[in-house]
Amino acid sequence: MSKAIVTGGAGFIGSNLVDRILPLYKEVIVIDNESSDANEQFYWNDKCTNHKLDICDYENIRPLFENVEVVFHLAAEARIQPTIKNPILSAKTNVVGTCTILQCAREANVKRVIYSSTSSGYGLKNKIPLNEEMPDDCLNPYSVTKVTGEKLCKMYTDLFGLETVAFRYFNVYGERQPIKGQYAPVIGIFIRQRDSGESMTIVGDGEQRRDFTHVSDVVTANVLASILENKEPVGKVLNIGTGTNHSILEIAKLIGDNYKFIESRLGEAQETLANTDRAKKMLGWVPSVKLEDWLEKNS
């Protein structure tokens, strides 16, 4: 293959993806501005062509798209609570930034853009398990802006012929997961708190349930979606989850026995659980990592 771009390629999911696709492309270009406060470090791969740039910076990122075959768009203002604190920044990065990436790809005749979205777009009103035909129920700036990105992808496919595939990830965890601050993903927070001798902080009563998906399975979905001969997922949204879920209290007990309960937070669903039939059918994708097995080995 020729070239690929990974936005957010020095972060958690992006850096794992970069490591996987390096053998598949003549050149992998990484765009990242190191803006995530939750990342303990950033993972720039020295085998890539690396650019510390903002995805909204059209003038500087546009030349990077020439002769690129596939764009993996992961850069975002991520996680719910930080976007509630700063909705303007989340709108700029997740909407304007995504539109900028799509426009650059369109102008450079990129063959396909693979977009990372979120299961939080399903909100509270939809019944479990969640499937892609259900209506959006966005409860916070994060879900609103990421789902808007999905709509932009669909529009660029329908109006301009740019092939796009959008993924709704369900609570990704694994190697290089963010651990800093109170708004990092919960598994990373719990491991950090336990290792530092603190009590693990469980929001609310801990009975909220989440479908946790290992980062390697997310990476596999991205690689499968980049196979250009497969047109079936183009213009579609696909769930990437496991089809099983665990309560936050269960997760805490798997990691340690020192925990406490803190006040509930606004804008978060009580339960997530993915129906992954579409990803299985269109990509041949199935999750391979069980949360309990990973925690036993890594926590």
Predicted regions and their residues:
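N-terminal Rossmann-like NAD(P)+-binding domain of SDR-like oxidoreductases, especially those catalyzing
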Residues: 1-170, 285
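Gly/Ser/Thr-rich beta-alpha loop segments that engage phosphate groups in nucleotides
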Residues: 10-13, 99, 125, 145, ...
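Residues that form or immediately flank small-molecule/cofactor binding pockets and catalytic motifs
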Residues: 55, 135, 174, 207, ...
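NAD(P)-dependent short-chain dehydrogenase/reductase
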Residues: 127-128, 151-210, 215-224, 245, ...
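C-terminal substrate-binding subdomain of Rossmann-fold SDR/epimerase-dehydratase oxidoreductases
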Residues: 195-299
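Residue-level signal for the nucleotide or nucleotide-sugar donor/cofactor binding architecture
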Residues: 56, 85, 93-96, 133, ...
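Residues in well-ordered alpha-helical elements
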Residues: 59-62, 69, 81, 88, ...
